[in-house]
Amino acid sequence: MLNNVMNNALSGVNAAQGGLSVISNNLANAGVGYYHRQSAVFGENPGTMTPNGYFGNGTYFSHVRREFDEFVNAQYSQSRARSGDYEAYVKNCNKVDDLLTNDIEDLSGSIGSFFTALDSASSDASDKTLIDVFLGQSNALVSQFKEADRQLQEMERDINRQIENKVKDINIYAEKIAGLNQQIARVRSVSGSEPNDLLDVRDRLVNEVNSVIGVKVIEQNGNYNVTFANGLPLVTGEKANRLEAMPSSKDDSRFSIGFVGANDQVREIPDEAFKGGELSGVLRSRQEVLDPAYQKINKLALVFATKFNEIHQKGFDSNGETGKDFFAIGKGSVVSNTFNTGKTDFDLSYSDVSQVTGKNYEMRFDGGKWNVTRLPDGVEVKVDTSTPGSLKFEGIELKITTNNPNQGDTFVVKPMNGVINNMQTLVTDSAQFAKAGSKDAGPGDNENIKELVKLQDQKLIDGGSTFSDFYATLVNDVGSRTKQAQIDSETQNKMTESFYRQEQEISGVNMNEESIQMQKSSNSLMPMLRY
């Protein structure tokens, strides 16, 4: 009987020591954000039948249970993906918004100063000084356009860099998760126990990769299989697949994301396939904010310069010569898909700038017919092919200079690409300024200047906007979208914090509770030590 008492006490001591070890580990890791609280699980030893009855044989330390709720953790992880998307989106929206409102002088104000100087020249067309001031203001306006264009192009390059960096991060996470799958499987096979510390690290990595790229996780035979973009495998068991930042086959100036498959074959993934995570936010900000801003500022420059040139050409300069183009302006481009098998070249021009939308287009050759869709909405556009060797649509004319397309060849038409880049004031001498309305007019003839001044108030863009109104609408659109994105981001972050609190209620360490448990274990240990 005495032996039984001592054995029972010893089993209790061993179990209590195990419990205290678990509690102390919880307390030590209380400040580790991804740590999951552990609980000691005890069992009752089988009893012994004796003539005097059935006697118990104490307790035993069974195992360490990791407090983990798969559903709550999945909610938190998915919420982090949405937060990551908004965070990256807002960051890039803010850059465009700052450019349009703070970083450079307001383009609308510069256009106003341009017409103010022009109106002053109209007050005394014979005053060379007033015309020189106007020409200086013209150069300042062109510089203003160019600076806005330069910064927007730099943002485009920065988007490419962001994509590269995100892809590098994703590949590192994938390798680490696959490595942990391998380590966890090895520990389980050798010891039969759960490597809770490794499980914690693996869940942390899944949460972190979800912040960068929205993923789905399926646990299979103890491994985490991680997929993204509608089912592409990022991690399968102990194997990690790779992504690659690559020039888009549609437009090699822009990066897309490729999936590296068997034999290192890279398959380009459509941008819209990415849902959640910072990478998705970067891609969305490019399509929804940066591209439209670039296109609209270049459209403003195109219509402004073209309409000014049209009126200037109707006047006469101080030498009685017909006015020439006042502004030089660039023209768009047509980009061939890298997978095209034929050879087709185009020369882009503008048949009617008032009809130009500013959007990009995708052209596809289907046998004997060219099909054109507007980007990014995919709306089919009617093409005028009445002129041989020419395609006309929405104010654009494409003359086919090399005509050897194959079935399925595609092209991206970028009507606004490079417009501002090649913009400059061509009239540098006041004597070349076509101020007069007639050839034989005197030095004070300002009739054509007055016609030029009228352009300021004419609704020449989209059939209903002045130059200043169009720019103000652009600024307002970007500002509104940025503000809404900030609100959405803040709301989503609060949801993520709420899910984290729910997760911590289950898996987090409560110092008070652990201290109470330690006291209880210590109290139960002391009587048994007396034996």
Residue spans for each PLM region:
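S/T-rich, low-complexity, solvent-exposed segments of bacterial secretion/appendage proteins
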Residues: 1-531
